[in-house]
Amino acid sequence: MMVIRPVERSDVSALMQLASKTGGGLTSLPANEATLSARIERAIKTWQGELPKSEQGYVFVLEDSETGTVAGICAIEVAVGLNDPWHNYRVGTLVHASKELNVYNALPTLFLSNDHTGSSELCTLFLDPDWRKEGNGYLLSKSRFMFMAAFRDKFNDKVVAEMRGVIDEHGYSPFWQSLGKRFFSMDFSRADFLCGTGQKAFIAELMPKHPIYTHFLSQEAQDVIGQVHPQTAPARAVLEKEGFRYRNYIDIFDGGPTLECDIDRVRAIRKSRLVEVAEGQPAQGDFPACLVANENYHHFRVVLARTDPATERLILTAAQLDALKCHAGDRVRLVRLCAVEKTA
């Protein structure tokens, strides 16, 4: 059975293996053991209540409960940009016009922005390619909404998610090549690694301070503004079906889109509810997959179960209850895994 649980210190080697499979561009999952160990420690201290809000971050892993294999990772930053500035570009417009010459040009322009300062962030989503099946990707991504719904007061009103931009298997980023490299004088992979290992001071020091007309970039770079890496397209679709939208903010490195949503408008958060759980044999039928989570802050767990999402009393097997660290009579959080498709 696949289970979402909080990260533990013993997971560092598994996270290193996952990091080696990302193919680059996933800034918050660098293949650096010291950085990953520090990330785990920060998550543990967050759960223990030892950090200020500006440093808090939760990390979860997807584990096969039978073998102990860690198949994926996901995380939530509680409030970005309160310690180090959180930069992105806002894609806006500058108009240059002359009535006398009968010239009017509306030019797409990139403005350096810190507009998302203080927002909660969904980040570090990665599922081992060998485990991309049977709803694991949905479970990994959406489990975070169950945690946010259960502990709503720990998060801010806006949630953002940076999507990985277009970068090839050799680490080539058209957007970086045309823009970032001119200011940073280093390859994309180097800048990405420095940022991922916490060495972010160079961003504020070297970033262009003035608006940038996108027409001055290569056509290849212009074409990838707001576009996602092919492997990230499913993750973007998942978030958009939950209510997230692209509001013309992009990553400063690879030009990937930043999606955002008011936390209380996220479908899985808004529609999740608490039901009593009982042990038994679940009813057979053509039921949809649902997310089921406990309400235990320190021992949070999420699993998938096929059941009626409108039930008032959820029947789970002994194995499912054990995976959730629940007992009969406890209340669990339940929501349909995927939104019901509307028909005309």
Curated annotation (Swiss-Prot):
The keyword Acyltransferase applies. It catalyses: succinyl-CoA + L-arginine = N(2)-succinyl-L-arginine + CoA + H(+). Belongs to the arginine N-succinyltransferase family. The lineage of its organism: Bacteria, Pseudomonadati, Pseudomonadota, Gammaproteobacteria, Enterobacterales. It comes from the Bacteria. Its EC number is 2.3.1.109. Succinyl-CoA binds at L125. Keywords: Acyltransferase, Arginine metabolism, Transferase. This is Arginine N-succinyltransferase. The keyword Magnesium does not apply. GO terms for biological process: arginine catabolic process to glutamate; arginine catabolic process to succinate. The active site is at H229. Catalyzes the transfer of succinyl-CoA to arginine to produce N(2)-succinylarginine. GO terms for molecular function: arginine N-succinyltransferase activity. Pathway: Amino-acid degradation; L-arginine degradation via AST pathway; L-glutamate and succinate from L-arginine: step 1/5. InterPro entries: Acyl_CoA_acyltransferase, Arg_succinylTrfase_AstA/AruG, Arginine_N-succinylTrfase. It comes from Shigella boydii serotype 4 (strain Sb227).
